[in-house]
């Protein structure tokens, strides 16, 4: 009988991860059958999707509230199928609110469970470790420090590296990226990434644009380039940019990035420095070895929600940006909340743009970080999943 694996991925990043894991599983266990919730990358590997990935996609608390009936229906159907015909192992990729609950019920029924991408308990709500311990047979984590954390808590864990480290080149090619984007080879370029969500753009774009205007005043030759994930976000950003004009500002979307490389990656690679919203983009910037200034602002309402959910006013770690968390140091500046003024952002970004010695030091630290994160992620993940399945057989 062929190996059967249940899987749930709820976001494009999870779909990409899962697609590569399925490829790794197929190389080691020909005939393996994977089914559950997934996206196009998983489907391309023969995944049987009971529900499309977007069935789990929500945008903020209001959207989540509106989607409760459909989310519960999807959850109930997936749980019923997996309990009726238990797989050899279940793999939840990220989406912790959905997957940890499902994993707990499956594990209680005797199905071993693997969770890929550890929730950020190291940043807030550490008490979730108890839910993870009850729900998960084996954790697969992306960052080296997470392995020690879960091992200390008695949870079987495997560090599999971060897949981005295997995709982004160890030695970025600034000239090639500029050629793709039509940017002069000798220009000074600032990449501006105010986030991919409407709320992030609304709160960060005005500050970033005012900072950029000051930087262009200091250096009229400076080129500011803003990658946008889709035309809708571009329209939202450009409406704000009309109120905060920056000479020579350029927005680019996927069609202008040329080739399969995400346009944001091309802009990072082409840049001298990056002004970036906290999130995965900070890790991508680090892997491109670029100096950066990290910023984030929450609305007053979201500040209250986050404080209530976490039961704390401050995070467990002094760092917010992933590069700083991984390096355990303020390697790059973080300007958050009330500190994220246009003047402060401009000053920190000017330093990132003009300090050549500092840029060389950052490049060396980010190169070492890249090497630490570089593993054969699909192979390591597939091997761990198969070992969990074999152990339960």
From Swiss-Prot:
Q: Which domain of life is it from?
A: Bacteria
Q: Name one GO molecular function term.
A: lipid-A-disaccharide synthase activity
Which top EC class is given?
Answer: transferase
Instruction: List the keywords (alphabetical).
Output: Glycosyltransferase, Lipid A biosynthesis, Lipid biosynthesis, Lipid metabolism, Transferase
SUPFAM superfamilies, sorted: UDP-Glycosyltransferase/glycogen phosphorylase
Q: Which GO biological process entries does UniProt record here?
A: lipid A biosynthetic process
| Entries under PANTHER family matching the protein | LIPID-A-DISACCHARIDE SYNTHASE, LIPID-A-DISACCHARIDE SYNTHASE, MITOCHONDRIAL-RELATED
What does it do? Condensation of UDP-2,3-diacylglucosamine and 2,3-diacylglucosamine-1-phosphate to form lipid A disaccharide, a precursor of lipid A, a phosphorylated glycolipid that anchors the lipopolysaccharide to the outer membrane of the cell.
Q: What is this protein called?
A: Lipid-A-disaccharide synthase
Q: Which organism is it from?
A: Bordetella parapertussis (strain 12822 / ATCC BAA-587 / NCTC 13253)
